[in-house]
Amino acid sequence: MAGGGLQTAMTARTLESHPIHLGKGATAVPQPEFPRDERAIQWYRDYGARHADDGEEGRLVSCYGFAEDWPGWEMHPAGAEVVVCLEGSMTLIQKIGGEEVRTTLKPGEYAINPPGTWHTADVPEAATGLFITAGAGTQHRPR
C-alpha cells in the first residue's frame, strides 16, 4: 500500500449509523455506532477524546435524518461546516451580524456555516443531511 500504511479489509457501513472521522495525514476512520437517544452526548464526548490529537484539523462526516425543526442552535468555533441536503428540504438559519440569514437547501445543494456562526435549521417535512464538521469546541444553546 502506498505511504506504508496498513491495509485492512473494506466493510460496508451506513454513514447514518457509523460516521467517519477525517484526520491529519489524510486519514479516514470509521466511528463506533452512533446512538439515536440520550447516549448521543456521551458518543460526541468519546469521539472528541478519541481524536483529540487531530485538534482543529479533524472533521466528522455524518448523516442525519430529520422529521422536524432542530430544537437548538449550535456553533463550531474551530472551522467551517459543510451542510449538504440529500433528501427533502431544509432551511438553514445562520446568525450573522445579529440577523437571521435563511438559506433553503434542496437535494444536492449545500451551504457552509463559517467558523463561529450560530446556526439551526427548519425542516418543513422530512429531510436528510450530510455534514462535514470541524467539531472541536462545538457549543449548543436552546432555540
Predicted regions and their residues:
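A short, N-terminal "cap"/entry segment at the start of jelly-roll beta-barrel domains
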Residues: 1-72
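A short beta-loop-beta micro-motif enriched in histidine and acidic residues
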Residues: 56, 67-82, 98-99
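A short hydrophobic beta-strand segment most commonly corresponding to one strand
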Residues: 61, 125-142
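Short beta-strand segments in beta-sandwich/barrel cores
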Residues: 71, 88-94, 109-110
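Short glycine/proline-enriched turns and hinge-like loops at secondary-structure junctions
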Residues: 76, 104, 123-125
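Short, conserved beta-strand element in jelly-roll/cupin
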Residues: 77-92, 132
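Short acidic-glycine-tyrosine-enriched beta hairpin
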Residues: 97-115
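Short, charged beta-turn/beta-strand-edge "cap" motif at the junction between a beta-strand
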Residues: 117-120
